[in-house]
């Protein structure tokens, strides 16, 4: 039923984007039940009041450039399975067990590194059982063979994955494998190879994004990156050496650009906006990021000891409970 409604919505967006999107936003606000949906549709109504809003261009590009099955699958997986069904499981689990659960997990994958796909798959399997259906995976290096990684995405068909590519060229065959994963968004780092990588992925109907690693809060640089972006979604990610005050300034700047758009790009400051979603779902925030060496990264730059290969996700969440990683959103 949900997928049929999404199919109809995609068709209508192709034919009459402005009218269909407004209709969806109005209906969504009227019938939304969950915390996240109410916030999302309130925002959508506000942003789409302007007939010349660049967000109409974004939606038109998405329906024109993206495989519709991929758009539907990824959209349902993150919009319903993660932010509605999964969010309900997370709230119930937090109430029962007394510690915070994030709505997503960040994992760094290095082929042949300590954090292997078997352990990643185990964390995902357990995460889904407590409501975590979205996963961010940073590739530290391009794998020689993409088969195992894409099989991981296929094996969790109703989860949503966001894959961050390093600055290395994709091969045609690699892009073919990635395009077969309907539950996947692929982001190319803004560096020397990203335009060619985005071209290959767009040719195959993938949902694409760009990500940019920043170390300062230069407003002109932020605007330039948004203006020059080749994708409808641009993710700003702070470098490890970026100062906290610069991160806050970038988060504020991105938030302002999003509410007063000039270009057909939706900008996101990854960690601050991740926390906004978590705050809506749980009323608190919790960040879980596992490095390729199996250490757990904390927001203050410190690390927990290396993740034991046999440690469960529940055990890890209990271990970080009370650390600076979790708490009220500010």
Feature-to-residue mapping (PLM):
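N-terminal [4Fe-4S]-dependent radical SAM core
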Residues: 34-107, 129
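Accessory C-terminal segments flanking Radical SAM cores
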Residues: 1-45, 254, 258-330
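Short, flexible, glycine/charge-rich loop motifs used to bind or transfer phosphoryl groups or to couple energy/partner
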Residues: 95-96, 152, 174
């Amino acid at each position: 039923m949900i997928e049929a409604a999404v199919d109809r919505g995609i068709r209508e967006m192709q034919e009459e984007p402005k009218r269909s999107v407004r209709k969806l936003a109005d209906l969504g606000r009227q019938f939304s039940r969950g915390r996240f949906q109410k916030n999302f549709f309130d925002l959508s109504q506000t942003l789409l009041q302007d007939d010349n809003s660049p967000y109409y261009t974004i939606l038109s590009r998405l329906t024109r450039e993206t495989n519709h099955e991929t758009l539907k699958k990824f959209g349902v997986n993150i919009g319903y399975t993660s932010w509605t069904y999964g969010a309900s499981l997370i709230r119930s689990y937090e109430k029962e067990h007394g510690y915070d659960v994030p709505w997503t997990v960040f994992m760094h994958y290095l082929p042949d590194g300590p954090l292997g796909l078997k352990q990643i798959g185990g964390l995902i399997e357990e995460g889904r059982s407590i409501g975590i259906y979205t996963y961010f995976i940073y590739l530290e290096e391009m794998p020689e063979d993409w088969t195992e990684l894409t099989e991981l995405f296929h094996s969790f068909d109703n989860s949503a994955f966001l894959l961050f590519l390093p600055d290395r060229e994709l091969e045609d065959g690699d892009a073919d494998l990635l395009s077969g994963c309907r539950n996947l968004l692929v982001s190319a780092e803004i560096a020397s190879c990203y335009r060619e990588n985005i071209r290959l992925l767009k040719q195959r109907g993938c949902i694409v994004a760009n990500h940019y690693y920043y170390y300062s809060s230069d407003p002109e640089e932020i605007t330039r990156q948004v203006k020059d972006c080749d994708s409808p979604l641009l993710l700003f990610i702070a470098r490890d050496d970026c100062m906290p005050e610069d991160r806050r300034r970038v988060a504020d700047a991105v938030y302002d650009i999003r509410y007063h758009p000039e270009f057909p790009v939706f900008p996101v400051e990854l960690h601050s906006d991740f926390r906004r979603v978590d705050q809506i779902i749980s009323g608190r925030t919790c960040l879980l990021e596992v490095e390729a060496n199996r250490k757990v990264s904390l927001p203050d730059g410190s690390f927990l000891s290396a993740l034991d290969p046999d440690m469960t996700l529940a055990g890890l969440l209990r271990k970080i409970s009370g650390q600076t990683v979790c708490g009220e959103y500010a």
